[in-house]
Curated annotation (Swiss-Prot):
Binding residues for [4Fe-4S] cluster 1: 36, 72, 101
Disulfide bonds: none
Chain segments carrying region Disordered: 1-27
Record protein name field: Ribosomal protein uS12 methylthiotransferase RimO
Any one GO CC term of the record: cytosol
Origin organism lineage: Bacteria, Pseudomonadati, Pseudomonadota, Alphaproteobacteria, Rhodobacterales
Organism name: Ruegeria sp. (strain TM1040)
Pfam families: Radical_SAM (PF04055), TRAM_2 (PF18693), UPF0004 (PF00919)
Signal peptide: none
Domain MTTase N-terminal positions: 27-137
Location of the TRAM domain: 400-467
Length: 467
């Protein structure tokens, strides 16, 4: 992965803590979760099922009877990281079960690590459980093995990823996710809302809505209507977002939307984000990938970059405080210097708030591998540096304009010196910036939503004082 990762990286988040110590003679398992938040949610579901069957969860290799490695296979660099993690687990523990996206290539994994116990593909929960049962038989004690209503969480207690669908119907040439995770399969709206309600009741202050294609949610279900409370809710991203934003008052809950593909109906979400009574944040994580129409066509992406600028202007007219985050690929096969300069010029016009970028690399099975005119590595690096220099300048100017403003922030961490690491509504965990409070934090707790006045700005971060 690059130093500015294109995806959320929950594996970089603080290490989770698990309830109580295992009871005597309780079988225990370890979990290594790599890749994106969708994989993290899969890990949480696997661990929740295993906890319900009486397994304990070990935070280290030594205390585990076996280790599950949930892999990533999106990029070749991610595959290498997954193989390294499998090797480490084998060395430190010896009993290893592999699952996740790289699990779709069992022969490839066994070629490198023939001693693994089993391999399963992504979101194949039952097969993972079968492999665990074979390696470490369960030993449940229903009077002792208590499980929280929200299941096992691998994130800090005040925020949680909420997966609303699996798979993707797009055929972007650089991506193999549809091959690994299949076509779009949306969860029923009432099932998503029930899970979200449990999380909020348990004290979660921020719901991060994720999927492979959030704005396509419900398309495969023909936007069916589901019963919810005293009424109904449609399986459509606008209706679902509105209902999520009504689970708690807007000063007590944040709902953040990620992976929002730039469909025309995204504009329906913007008035919701501008509504101060709804908890849906004015924040869109929307993967543009590039701006030049010819590059977008070679990617098999929507190629109307000029219309995208019009959409951005329309969004900001309705919701001036909206934060736009996006990711881009530089050095895509065939990308010329003129096409790259077009992207830089587009960035000047779009003025995106948060930007990630990564250099193109081949991925086994991706159609882009066979495109002509691959870009030299030194050219990719040069373009990445120039792109990030542009993005940094835009970020620095935008953050400087926030000095003197009063903002609501969520507290993520308080260190031993009393310095609080927080985030504004414009900042998603791990991938965006932070706001730091240096003093007066004695009465703060992780997860608090508080008001601060911004008194200093940097390239990506802010500093402020409680108000």
């Amino acid at each position: 992965m690059t130093s500015n990762p294109p995806d959320l990286r929950p594996d970089l988040a603080p290490k989770p803590t698990f309830g109580t110590a295992p009871r005597p003679d309780q079988p225990t398992l370890g979990m290594v979760s790599l890749g994106c938040p969708k994989a993290l949610v899969d890990s949480e579901r696997i661990l929740t099922r295993l906890r319900a069957e009486g397994y304990g969860i070990s935070a280290d290799y030594a205390g585990a009877d076996a280790v599950i490695v949930n892999t990533c296979g999106f990029l070749d660099s991610a595959k290498a990281e997954s193989l390294e993690a499998i090797g480490e687990a084998l060395k430190e523990n010896g009993k290893v079960i592999v699952t996740g996206c790289l699990g779709a290539e069992p022969d490839y994994i066994r070629e490198h690590h023939p001693r693994i116990l089993a391999v399963t593909g992504p979101h194949q929960y039952e097969q993972v459980l079968d492999a665990v049962h074979a390696a470490v038989p369960p030993s449940p004690d229903p009077f002792v093995d208590l499980l929280p209503a929200t299941g096992v969480s691998l994130t800090p207690r005040h925020f949680s990823y909420l997966k609303i669908s699996e798979g993707c119907n797009h055929k972007c040439k650089f991506c193999i996710i549809p091959d690994m995770r299949g076509k779009l399969a949306s969860r029923p709206a009432h099932a998503v809302l029930r899970e979200a309600e449990k999380l909020v009741t348990a004290g979660v202050r921020e719901l991060l809505v994720i999927s492979q294609d959030t704005s396509a949610y419900g398309l495969d279900r023909k936007y069916d209507v589901n019963p919810w409370k005293d009424g109904e809710v449609r399986s459509h991203i606008t209706d679902l977002s509105r209902a999520l934003g009504e689970l708690a008052p807007a000063d007590q809950l944040w709902v953040r939307l990620h992976y929002v593909y730039p469909y025309p109906h995204v504009r329906e979400l913007i008035p919701l984000m501008a509504d101060p009574e709804n908890a849906v944040l004015p924040y869109l994580d929307i993967p543009f990938q590039h701006a030049h129409p010819d590059v977008l066509r070679r990617m098999a992406r929507p190629a109307a970059a000029a219309k995208t600028l019009d959409e951005i202007r329309a969004w900001r007219a309705i919701c001036p405080d909206i934060t736009l985050r996006s990711t881009f690929i530089v050095g895509y096969p065939g990308e010329t210097e003129a096409e790259f300069q077009h992207l830089l010029d587009w960035m000047d016009e779009a003025q995106l708030d948060r930007v990630g970028c990564f250099k193109y690399e081949n991925v086994d099975g991706a159609r882009s591998n066979d495109l002509p005119d691959h870009v030299a590595e030194e050219v990719k690096q040069n373009r990445w540096e120039r792109f990030m220099e542009k993005a940094q300048a835009i970020s620095e100017a935008k953050l400087a304009s926030k000095v003197g403003q009063t903002l609501q922030v969520i507290v993520d961490e308080i260190d031993e010196d009393g310095i609080a690491t927080c985030r504004t509504k414009a900042d998603a965990p791990e991938i965006d910036g932070n706001l730091f409070i240096d003093e007066g934090t004695a009465n703060l707790s992780v997860g608090d939503l508080v008001t601060v006045e911004v008194d200093e700005a940097g390239e990506y971060d802010l500093w402020g004082a409680l108000r």
